[in-house]
Amino acid sequence: MCLPGLETQGGDFEFEVEKVKTPTPSQTRRQGWGSHLSVFASPILQVFGVSLLCVGVAVSQVSKPTAKPPVEFSPPVPHTNAPLGLIPRMPGDGDGAYKTHHYRDLFAEQGHPPEESRAKIEKAFQRLFHGDGQEQRIYFETGANENGALAYITDWANNDARTEGMSYGMMIAVQLNKKREFDALWNWANTYMLITDPKDPSVGYFAWSMNTDGTPRSTGAAPDGEEYFVMSLYFAAHRWGNGQGIYNYKAEADKILRGMRHHPVLTGVGPFRIHHEDPPFVAPDHSWPSPNNKRREQEAAAKGEKLQAFHAPWDAPHSETIGPMVDEDHFMIKFVANQDINFTDASYHLPAFYELWARWGPEEDREFWAKAADVSRDMFLKVTGPETGLTPDRNYFDFTQIISRDGAPTPFSYDSWRSVSNWSVDYSWWHKAPQETMLSDRIQNFLYGQGIGTFVDRYTLDGKPLSDRHSVGMVATTAVGSLAATPGPISKAFVEELWKTPVPSGEQRYYDGMLYLMSLMHCSGNFRIIE
């Protein structure tokens, strides 16, 4: 989950995005997000049109005078989503890889032998999972418990472990038949991230951000992690069979998937705990120790300023109501499970996975996921920029834009990189939605025009650059777009660009590296439905 502007500089409740000196994705994505209390339910923050969901979380700021909204500014009217309306239904198995068992190898189509692709994937895996601990790997084993080895995937630059990365790591492991790594990650997630305290209304979900020692940075969940947990567990059940306890993969997948739709509506008063025996989680009075924050402290000191820890008013006791991760009326995954959230994140939408859940998941939920797949396909078409193919980081359930206090709609940002991969994999596996070809053509044509080796990683939906960084993760996911794009020079150029891109290393290797490795697997036909 990525909300732009969190680590920008400003006074109280001042979060503005500047093009100059753009923070890296790991600086901005998810840092400081906790239990995800809805901003739109907070009169204080609603005035500013900011999605600040940081219950009990310290957010780093540079100390500056408090900025006031202009006199003529008036708070936005709370949005009421329109009914879903008619959605084109796409029953049956389609004509994609699920039916044909054929997965395109885009690299082989351009003259790179399959054995070279497999070697490239294995090299990336070994570096990211077992390479040098300072510069290359993001997978770290931490001993064992009664369930076996324990390991986490870390966002190195922010020094935390996230359900997003844990579930991505599990998906990579099951696809590449790396059972030890899969089980160690799943064991760590269950041991430390699974919320078991019945007084936490997010009980049964996984806390989205943790310190790498297993202590919390949050006490709430982000649905993109749960989604990849579910899919990787079903694949593990089919690849390795079911074991006992937490290694009964199908039972665990069913349990999470049921919870995503049927989690009871619970209200609690925080601060909350992950486990009953834990102390209540209250954010520290300083920024979390990390390479990103250290750099920001140095930059602030050079200007004669001090990096301060900003605490939201919810550090005091607060009430929070949590329910399902889906909106029943709109058949959509929610941004977070808070009851008052009325918007989604396009990059959370995984119609290729939903089709499988409609076949493999709990019987009572299969029709829901079948329709959710069709809704996601329709949403991609309706929320993308008509000339650019860029998706917003967030939009309302009725496909309308979320407008900030300055009148600007939510832009294409770091989470958004994943959307093109999501609809293109859906096209590859199911071949049900021909409009996905048009969408891949649009985004590839736009970014090619920006410069295939120089396009930036944040834009307005109509194509105005909002950053100055060219990101490997975005190159990788856009290359996956070639699974759906019209074959031609542009789609081939993106595949070749990914082929010649080295494995990400250094401080920002987490998000770029995860997307890079999964994209190599998709583009080579090695990311498959495991039946």
Predicted regions: what they are:
Residues 42-56:
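Bacterial N-terminal signal peptides
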Residues 58-60:
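Boundary at the C-terminal end of the N-terminal hydrophobic targeting segment
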Residues 78-123, 127-130, 134-137, 156-163, ...:
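Extended ligand-binding clefts on enzyme/binding-domain cores
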Residues 159-169, 215-241:
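Aromatic-rich carbohydrate-recognition surfaces in CAZymes
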Residues 169, 181-182, 246, 253, ...:
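Solenoid-repeat scaffolds in large eukaryotic assemblies
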Residues 179-221, 454-458:
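Helix-terminus loop motifs that line ligand-binding clefts
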Residues 497-507:
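Solenoid-like repeat scaffolds
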